[in-house]
Amino acid sequence: MSPVAVVTGGASGIGLGVARHLAADGHDVAVLDQNGEGADAAAAALRAQGARALGVEVDVADRHSVEAGFARVRAELGPVAILVTSAGIEAFDPLLEISAERWDRIIAVNLTGTFSCVQSAVPDMLDAGWGRIVTISSQSAQSGAPNMAHYSASKGGVIALTKALAVDLARQGITVNSIAPSLVDTPMARAAEATGDFPGVDVIGPMVPLGRAGTPADIAAACSFLCAESGSYITGQILGVNGGMYIW
Protein backbone atom coordinates (compact mmCIF):
# COMPACT_ATOMS: atom_id res chain seq x y z
CA MET A 1 0.00 0.00 0.00
CA SER A 2 1.31 3.45 -0.91
CA PRO A 3 1.81 6.12 1.76
CA VAL A 4 -1.30 8.21 2.35
CA ALA A 5 -1.01 11.96 1.79
CA VAL A 6 -3.67 14.36 3.05
CA VAL A 7 -3.92 17.71 1.29
CA THR A 8 -6.24 20.31 2.82
CA GLY A 9 -7.67 22.93 0.51
CA GLY A 10 -7.08 20.37 -2.21
CA ALA A 11 -10.03 21.15 -4.46
CA SER A 12 -8.41 24.11 -6.20
CA GLY A 13 -5.36 26.33 -6.48
CA ILE A 14 -2.17 25.38 -4.68
CA GLY A 15 -3.79 22.46 -2.88
CA LEU A 16 -5.01 20.90 -6.11
CA GLY A 17 -1.56 21.29 -7.65
CA VAL A 18 -0.02 19.56 -4.63
CA ALA A 19 -2.57 16.74 -4.72
CA ARG A 20 -1.84 16.11 -8.39
CA HIS A 21 1.91 16.05 -7.85
CA LEU A 22 1.77 13.74 -4.84
CA ALA A 23 -0.52 11.38 -6.73
CA ALA A 24 1.96 11.37 -9.62
CA ASP A 25 4.67 10.56 -7.07
CA GLY A 26 2.77 7.38 -6.23
CA HIS A 27 0.99 8.38 -3.04
CA ASP A 28 -2.59 7.65 -2.16
CA VAL A 29 -4.18 11.08 -1.78
CA ALA A 30 -7.02 12.38 0.36
CA VAL A 31 -8.34 15.71 -0.91
CA LEU A 32 -9.89 17.65 1.96
CA ASP A 33 -11.81 20.82 1.23
CA GLN A 34 -14.75 22.85 2.51
CA ASN A 35 -16.12 22.51 -1.01
CA GLY A 36 -17.20 18.89 -0.86
CA GLU A 37 -18.19 18.68 -4.52
CA GLY A 38 -14.85 20.16 -5.51
CA ALA A 39 -12.99 17.67 -3.32
CA ASP A 40 -14.91 14.78 -4.89
CA ALA A 41 -14.23 16.09 -8.39
CA ALA A 42 -10.51 16.49 -7.70
CA ALA A 43 -10.31 12.97 -6.28
CA ALA A 44 -12.22 11.56 -9.24
CA ALA A 45 -9.77 13.22 -11.63
CA LEU A 46 -6.86 11.68 -9.73
CA ARG A 47 -8.48 8.26 -9.87
CA ALA A 48 -8.95 8.67 -13.61
CA GLN A 49 -5.17 9.07 -13.82
CA GLY A 50 -4.68 5.80 -11.97
CA ALA A 51 -4.23 7.08 -8.43
CA ARG A 52 -6.00 5.90 -5.32
CA ALA A 53 -7.78 9.02 -4.08
CA LEU A 54 -10.58 10.15 -1.81
CA GLY A 55 -12.47 13.44 -1.57
CA VAL A 56 -13.67 14.54 1.86
CA GLU A 57 -15.67 17.63 2.80
CA VAL A 58 -13.93 19.25 5.77
CA ASP A 59 -14.10 22.70 7.35
CA VAL A 60 -10.68 23.12 8.95
CA ALA A 61 -12.07 25.80 11.28
CA ASP A 62 -14.41 23.18 12.80
CA ARG A 63 -12.50 20.75 15.01
CA HIS A 64 -15.20 18.09 14.86
CA SER A 65 -15.25 18.29 11.05
CA VAL A 66 -11.47 17.85 10.97
CA GLU A 67 -11.54 14.84 13.28
CA ALA A 68 -14.36 13.21 11.32
CA GLY A 69 -12.54 13.84 8.05
CA PHE A 70 -9.31 12.24 9.23
CA ALA A 71 -11.24 9.29 10.64
CA ARG A 72 -12.74 8.73 7.21
CA VAL A 73 -9.32 8.94 5.57
CA ARG A 74 -7.98 6.26 7.93
CA ALA A 75 -10.98 4.03 7.34
CA GLU A 76 -10.87 4.26 3.54
CA LEU A 77 -7.20 4.82 2.68
CA GLY A 78 -5.17 4.01 5.78
CA PRO A 79 -2.97 5.86 8.27
CA VAL A 80 -1.71 9.32 7.35
CA ALA A 81 1.97 9.57 6.40
CA ILE A 82 2.03 13.01 4.78
CA LEU A 83 0.09 16.17 5.58
CA VAL A 84 0.05 19.33 3.48
CA THR A 85 -2.01 22.14 4.98
CA SER A 86 -3.02 24.29 2.04
CA ALA A 87 -6.49 25.29 3.24
CA GLY A 88 -6.64 29.02 3.81
CA ILE A 89 -8.43 32.26 3.07
CA GLU A 90 -7.06 35.63 2.03
CA ALA A 91 -8.32 38.95 3.30
CA PHE A 92 -7.72 42.56 2.33
CA ASP A 93 -8.90 45.21 4.82
CA PRO A 94 -7.46 48.48 6.14
CA LEU A 95 -6.27 48.04 9.71
CA LEU A 96 -9.01 50.10 11.35
CA GLU A 97 -11.70 48.29 9.39
CA ILE A 98 -10.77 44.80 10.58
CA SER A 99 -13.58 43.66 12.85
CA ALA A 100 -13.07 41.22 15.70
CA GLU A 101 -15.20 38.71 13.81
CA ARG A 102 -13.11 39.10 10.66
CA TRP A 103 -9.88 38.69 12.63
CA ASP A 104 -11.17 35.60 14.42
CA ARG A 105 -12.29 33.97 11.16
CA ILE A 106 -8.91 34.43 9.47
CA ILE A 107 -7.06 33.04 12.49
CA ALA A 108 -9.54 30.16 12.81
CA VAL A 109 -9.05 28.98 9.24
CA ASN A 110 -5.40 29.75 8.57
CA LEU A 111 -3.74 29.11 11.92
CA THR A 112 -6.08 27.10 14.14
CA GLY A 113 -7.14 25.01 11.15
CA THR A 114 -3.52 24.12 10.49
CA PHE A 115 -3.02 23.20 14.14
CA SER A 116 -6.14 21.02 14.24
CA CYS A 117 -5.11 19.11 11.12
CA VAL A 118 -1.62 18.53 12.49
CA GLN A 119 -3.01 17.19 15.76
CA SER A 120 -5.28 14.84 13.82
CA ALA A 121 -2.50 13.52 11.58
CA VAL A 122 0.46 13.21 13.93
CA PRO A 123 -0.68 10.13 15.91
CA ASP A 124 -0.42 8.02 12.74
CA MET A 125 3.05 9.38 12.07
CA LEU A 126 4.17 8.67 15.63
CA ASP A 127 2.96 5.08 15.30
CA ALA A 128 4.95 4.69 12.08
CA GLY A 129 8.05 6.54 13.27
CA TRP A 130 7.94 8.52 10.02
CA GLY A 131 6.04 11.48 8.69
CA ARG A 132 6.12 14.58 6.56
CA ILE A 133 4.26 17.79 7.33
CA VAL A 134 4.35 20.76 4.97
CA THR A 135 2.45 23.89 5.91
CA ILE A 136 1.67 26.63 3.43
CA SER A 137 2.50 30.05 4.85
CA SER A 138 3.11 33.24 2.87
CA GLN A 139 5.69 35.83 1.94
CA SER A 140 3.36 38.37 3.56
CA ALA A 141 4.23 36.83 6.93
CA GLN A 142 7.90 37.51 6.28
CA SER A 143 7.78 40.96 4.72
CA GLY A 144 4.36 42.31 5.66
CA ALA A 145 1.72 43.40 3.17
CA PRO A 146 -0.63 46.40 3.03
CA ASN A 147 -4.21 45.85 4.18
CA MET A 148 -3.36 42.31 5.25
CA ALA A 149 -2.56 42.58 8.96
CA HIS A 150 -4.95 39.73 9.82
CA TYR A 151 -3.78 37.47 7.00
CA SER A 152 -0.09 38.21 7.60
CA ALA A 153 -0.47 37.54 11.32
CA SER A 154 -2.21 34.24 10.68
CA LYS A 155 0.51 33.09 8.32
CA GLY A 156 3.21 34.32 10.68
CA GLY A 157 1.61 32.08 13.26
CA VAL A 158 1.84 29.19 10.82
CA ILE A 159 5.57 29.83 10.44
CA ALA A 160 6.10 29.88 14.22
CA LEU A 161 3.97 26.76 14.62
CA THR A 162 6.00 25.00 11.93
CA LYS A 163 9.26 25.70 13.74
CA ALA A 164 7.87 24.54 17.09
CA LEU A 165 6.50 21.35 15.57
CA ALA A 166 9.82 20.62 13.89
CA VAL A 167 11.56 20.74 17.26
CA ASP A 168 8.85 18.66 18.95
CA LEU A 169 8.73 15.92 16.34
CA ALA A 170 12.25 15.56 14.93
CA ARG A 171 13.24 12.68 17.22
CA GLN A 172 10.15 10.78 16.12
CA GLY A 173 11.20 10.75 12.46
CA ILE A 174 8.78 13.48 11.41
CA THR A 175 9.94 16.50 9.43
CA VAL A 176 7.96 19.73 9.45
CA ASN A 177 8.61 22.53 6.97
CA SER A 178 6.71 25.44 5.47
CA ILE A 179 6.50 26.77 1.94
CA ALA A 180 6.03 30.53 1.76
CA PRO A 181 4.71 31.53 -1.67
CA SER A 182 4.41 35.04 -2.99
CA LEU A 183 2.13 35.82 -5.93
CA VAL A 184 0.61 32.59 -7.27
CA ASP A 185 -1.90 32.49 -10.10
CA THR A 186 -4.84 30.73 -8.43
CA PRO A 187 -8.62 31.13 -8.44
CA MET A 188 -8.31 32.89 -5.06
CA ALA A 189 -5.85 35.42 -6.51
CA ARG A 190 -8.07 36.01 -9.53
CA ALA A 191 -11.08 36.53 -7.25
CA ALA A 192 -9.16 39.18 -5.28
CA GLU A 193 -8.23 40.80 -8.58
CA ALA A 194 -11.87 40.83 -9.69
CA THR A 195 -12.97 42.61 -6.50
CA GLY A 196 -10.20 45.20 -6.80
CA ASP A 197 -8.35 44.09 -3.68
CA PHE A 198 -5.03 44.09 -5.54
CA PRO A 199 -3.89 45.25 -8.99
CA GLY A 200 -3.91 41.83 -10.60
CA VAL A 201 -1.81 38.80 -11.42
CA ASP A 202 -0.92 40.11 -14.86
CA VAL A 203 0.09 43.49 -13.41
CA ILE A 204 2.19 42.22 -10.50
CA GLY A 205 3.63 39.18 -12.29
CA PRO A 206 6.12 41.14 -14.45
CA MET A 207 7.38 42.89 -11.30
CA VAL A 208 8.54 39.59 -9.82
CA PRO A 209 12.34 39.27 -10.25
CA LEU A 210 11.88 36.07 -12.25
CA GLY A 211 9.36 37.87 -14.41
CA ARG A 212 6.15 35.97 -13.76
CA ALA A 213 3.63 34.88 -11.18
CA GLY A 214 4.08 31.50 -9.58
CA THR A 215 1.87 28.56 -10.44
CA PRO A 216 0.41 25.81 -8.25
CA ALA A 217 2.83 23.44 -9.99
CA ASP A 218 5.78 25.51 -8.71
CA ILE A 219 4.60 25.11 -5.13
CA ALA A 220 3.76 21.45 -5.66
CA ALA A 221 7.26 20.64 -6.92
CA ALA A 222 8.81 22.07 -3.77
CA CYS A 223 6.30 20.21 -1.64
CA SER A 224 7.07 16.95 -3.41
CA PHE A 225 10.77 17.39 -2.66
CA LEU A 226 10.16 18.05 1.03
CA CYS A 227 7.92 14.97 1.27
CA ALA A 228 10.42 12.65 -0.43
CA GLU A 229 13.42 10.87 1.03
CA SER A 230 15.60 13.46 -0.70
CA GLY A 231 14.22 15.99 1.78
CA SER A 232 14.69 13.81 4.84
CA TYR A 233 17.43 15.97 6.41
CA ILE A 234 15.43 19.19 6.15
CA THR A 235 13.15 20.27 8.98
CA GLY A 236 12.03 23.50 10.59
CA GLN A 237 12.72 25.46 7.40
CA ILE A 238 10.70 28.12 5.60
CA LEU A 239 11.16 27.62 1.87
CA GLY A 240 10.36 30.73 -0.12
CA VAL A 241 8.93 29.72 -3.49
CA ASN A 242 8.44 33.30 -4.57
CA GLY A 243 10.35 34.09 -7.75
CA GLY A 244 12.76 36.27 -5.79
CA MET A 245 10.11 38.58 -4.32
CA TYR A 246 11.52 37.99 -0.84
CA ILE A 247 15.14 37.00 -0.30
CA TRP A 248 16.26 36.00 3.19
List PLM regions with ranges:
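Active-site loop immediately N-terminal to the catalytic Tyr-X3-Lys motif
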Residues: 93-96, 143-149, 171-172, 211, ...
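Substrate-binding pocket helix/loop in short-chain dehydrogenase/reductase
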Residues: 94-95, 102-107, 204
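Active-site helix of classical SDR
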Residues: 118, 154, 162
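Alpha-helical segment proximal to the catalytic Tyr-Lys
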Residues: 123, 167-168, 232
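Residue(s) in the substrate-gating loop at a strand-loop-helix junction
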Residues: 138
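Short C-terminal tail/terminal secondary-structure segment
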Residues: 143, 207, 224, 235-248
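Short, small/polar-rich loop/turn modules that mediate ligand/substrate recognition or access, typified
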Residues: 170, 175, 234-236
